[in-house]
Amino acid sequence: DNSPSEGEQTDTPELFTKRYNPDQSFYSKILGQEIKYSVLLPQEYLSESTGKYGVVFLLHGWGGNQSSWGPSGLNIQSIADAQTSNGSIRPLIYIMPEGFNSYFCNRYDGKFNYMDMFINELVPLIDKRFRTTASKTERAVAGFSMGGFGALSIASQHPETFSVSIGLSPS
């Protein structure tokens, strides 16, 4: 686990030696628990040390987890590599957080404020841990089913954070 300890975030992005990093986590003070996430880095990220990249947050469906977009699931690496190599998209960082069955929203009773954690803890953490272009114009959120609902909800409620939202069969 390459995660900084609670309260130990640095301003220097960490070094990574592989593109797909499935076992990342951090402690959320808002939710009072560990939050797992997977990361897919572009090939260029490993071969040079100064470039910055846009970020796409990929949200899973009901019953899924941070591995749902990984090699044994929807395989975002295969899709991203094909689209990058044919020039359809540029190299990007993909972040796949564990969303539980939260719809990526705050609970009505305030007992599980997932969206608050996402905006106030996860996004800033990613901008510190990785070489991101920390700007809403370089940040997107997408998801399928429950994650599609979450992607549309998060971006519509936080246009200061995301410039693109994609809901794939949002439920």
Could you tell me what each predicted segment is?
Residues 1-171:
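Non-catalytic cap/lid and distal C-terminal segments of serine-dependent acyl enzymes
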